[in-house]
Regions:
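C-terminal His-loop and adjacent cap/lid subdomain of alpha/beta-hydrolase
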Residues: 1-205
Length: 205
């Protein structure tokens, strides 16, 4: 934080505190983690699009999305057009999200039927995803490994690749130029299915 006056190149104490909360992810008042992880380090090049906006007034898509999602899709009973994200109650509202989560989410870590059928899956997530935290995917993978008996058992059917510098869905190219169009998970998946060669990498063009 700035020890002198606040400037565009230095964070105030309040700004630093906000950033720390972004990093830690949502918690209840007693410190219970409500969702795995927060906004990852390395996602800063994409904040203008999703979180902060830029000097030209572009970006800042997450607040707009969260507002309408909360009004009309998040809860069993829609709170309506007057609701704002500032009204979200971290003590009571997470439980209220569970009903619609059953409709929207496809994140069960129980892959027993998939594995028994001989299925193969390649998953990937960008480490620089500022809006769907990659820590959730890591958490899902760890739970899937536990249910499979071990990570080695899970690897017979599932390969997960965490991509440094990759934005949410690879929409914007990062500083290293990687975007979703640069990744090719299909070729190693097809090779895995046809030849039984377990993928150890995904090539980025």
């Amino acid at each position: 934080a700035c020890e002198a006056e606040d400037t565009p190149s230095c964070l105030s104490e309040d700004e630093s505190a906000t950033l720390a909360k972004w990093r830690q992810g949502p918690q209840s008042q007693d410190g219970t983690q409500l969702y795995p992880g927060g906004i990852p380090e390395g996602s800063e090049p994409f904040w203008w699009l999703w979180l902060t906006g830029n000097a030209q007034g572009a970006g800042r898509l997450v607040p707009a999305f969260n507002t309408d999602f909360g009004r009309y899709m998040a809860f069993p009973t829609d709170p309506g057009p007057a609701w704002t994200p500032a009204e979200f109650d971290f003590e009571t509202d997470p439980a209220r999200l569970a009903t619609m989560a059953e409709v929207y989410n496809g994140d069960s870590p129980d892959l027993s039927a998939f594995r028994a059928a001989g299925g193969k899956m390649i998953g990937w997530h960008g480490w620089a995803d500022a809006i769907v935290t990659p820590y959730k995917t890591v958490d899902w993978y760890e739970k899937a490994a536990a249910l499979a008996g071990s990570e080695e058992a899970l690897k017979e059917n599932v390969a997960l690749f965490m991509v440094p510098g990759l934005d949410h869905c690879g929409i914007l190219p990062g500083p290293d130029g990687i975007s979703a169009t640069a990744l090719d998970p299909m070729t190693p998946l097809e090779t895995w299915l046809a030849e039984g060669t377990v993928p150890t990498s995904i090539m980025a063009q």
